[in-house]
């Protein structure tokens, strides 16, 4: 896929808004659970891993890749990034300066984040589930 269009140039930054189960937007899109199958989280996690692995070589040394999903499932968020960094010694989780307040930090602190998610909360506390991780190439 990448080899078909890539010129060999490395990039300073890449945003990977990965395809996901959209489990974090059920509040706004109540049809999401009805359009998903039990195997979707695992299938999409494999696709996310494939995309991460395909894009990582395109990030120049010192560059960054921002990975995000609108999923609340660990396999599409923190577990995905833990697996990726375990398999890529040149990938380092990076603190995200200026991140919105009210975020819940996961392990390691201040590096991987997900917005608190409560679909039954009253406005204005209601918001979508979201995950992001900023990776820097060493």
For each feature predicted by the language model, list its residue ranges.
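C-terminal catalytic and target-recognition region of SAM-dependent MTase-like enzymes
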Residues: 1-15, 19-21, 27, 42, ...
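Short, functional N-terminal and low-complexity linear motifs
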Residues: 17-23, 48-53
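Glycine-rich S-adenosyl-L-methionine
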Residues: 32-60
